[in-house]
Amino acid sequence: MNDLAISLPTPAAGAAAPRIGFVSLGCPKALTDSELILTQLSAEGYATSKTFQGADLVIVNTCGFIDDAVRESLDTIGEALAENGKVIVTGCLGAKTGDGGGNLVRQMHPSVLAVTGPHATQEVMDAVHQHVPKPHDPFVDLVPPAGIKLTPKHYAYLKISEGCNHRCSFCIIPSMRGDLVSRPIGDVLTEAQRLFEGGVKELLVISQDTSAYGVDVKYRTGFWDGKPVKTRMLDLVAQLGELARKHGAWVRLHYVYPYPHVDEVLPLMAEGLVLPYLDVPFQHAHPDVLKRMKRPASGERNLERLLKWREACPQIVVRSTFIAGFPGETEAEFEYLLDFLKEAQIDRAGCFAYSPIEGAPANLLDGALPDAVREERRARFMAVAEAVSTAKLQRRVGSSMQVLVDSAPAMGRKGGVGRSYADAPEIDGTVKILPPSKASKTMKVGEFSRVRIVGSQGHDLIGELI
């Protein structure tokens, strides 16, 4: 989870701007909500404080997806109240109901100033204005071109839609974020262009269901750069790829459900327009488990689809997440999942032991497994996943790869850390770059370097500058 307090530029010289403490918890989608709020705060002349003490007010953007996240969010709200006393709560936990149908946050922390759900920038700002009046009207030139970002300058998340039309039995996101609402394609592309112009070298496309982009508006035609563009995944990815090419940048796709039309994007990857990387939330492989999960798409054809993708784009890297120990999962169904993992050769796989989430329909299913069994299956899954990943990484030894540099002490003369096209930030591995043999070879954070792979270590590769 992200736990960030950000210092915004103070726009008004000679006058102390009101200070807002800010904490962002949760997933990249919550992070983009935080960035929107921070951008608006900056535009209106607010600064932020890195500590709760001394701030005029504190905003906590919460996560409410799993029980651990709920506890962390409630604890953070409590800390902010204890240290500051003036707290606005936003995010997924803000939409969660407690006992008797009342708001959970209000029940646990009745003294908070305001509570909103996710993607509620205007509601948050209205609450801020009520308790800490804005110092002046916003002017666009007070805000950096890329807005206020919680990520390093060289990469950023681009949220293309909100909500989800699926009703997976283990998930409560639709109850918190609502049904799918696609952003207008012109707005998405305008934001992407602004990010690239602001120095972003890697754009990570996120949503609850990237493949469903435009379904809610029946793929209506929008406009970008004076030309008609359909609101659908293929058209969006193609336009993002062209923008990235002009700026020498990457586009990476996340939360891609394996619908048949995803096949149309593979040629764009094969020609290098976007990264040959797909983050696909398979969750399981056995058809019966997928039915109990109420997962969309034809799960029994996922292996066939993967093989087709690799035929169209041999260099493609697939990452996915899975759940072990779902209610009713038999040993045979779990073994089926392990066999799928071996045959599918998932490059990057993560696994969670099933955890009941308050309000999720899966809680009502028969066959709940003991904690020990769920954790044991998660460990077995990860052992297989790591063996597959290690073997695939070892095959890269001797090759050369383009790496986006994330860390480079002393201009890289002490070595550095970067990521290849196969590595998304925070969730995948890295490329550890050895100190160069010649002092003339340097690296710079946020720029690309060519690296020869000389070894592997766990989930990471080891390379040397070419």
From Swiss-Prot:
Its EC number is 2.8.4.4. It is an enzyme of class 2 (transferase). It catalyses: L-aspartate(89)-[ribosomal protein uS12]-hydrogen + (sulfur carrier)-SH + AH2 + 2 S-adenosyl-L-methionine = 3-methylsulfanyl-L-aspartate(89)-[ribosomal protein uS12]-hydrogen + (sulfur carrier)-H + 5'-deoxyadenosine + L-methionine + A + S-adenosyl-L-homocysteine + 2 H(+). Residues 18-133 form the MTTase N-terminal domain. The keyword Glycosyltransferase does not apply. SMART domains: Elp3. SUPFAM superfamilies: Radical SAM enzymes. [4Fe-4S] cluster 1 binds at C27, C63, C92. Binds 2 [4Fe-4S] clusters. One cluster is coordinated with 3 cysteines and an exchangeable S-adenosyl-L-methionine. Residues 150-391 form the Radical SAM core domain. GO terms for cellular component: cytosol. GO terms for molecular function: 4 iron, 4 sulfur cluster binding; aspartic acid methylthiotransferase activity; metal ion binding; protein methylthiotransferase activity. It is found in: Cytoplasm. Keywords: 4Fe-4S, Cytoplasm, Iron, Iron-sulfur, Metal-binding, S-adenosyl-L-methionine, Transferase. Residues 394-466 form the TRAM domain. HAMAP family: MTTase_RimO (MF_01865). Belongs to the methylthiotransferase family. RimO subfamily. This is Ribosomal protein uS12 methylthiotransferase RimO. The lineage of its organism: Bacteria, Pseudomonadati, Pseudomonadota, Betaproteobacteria, Burkholderiales.
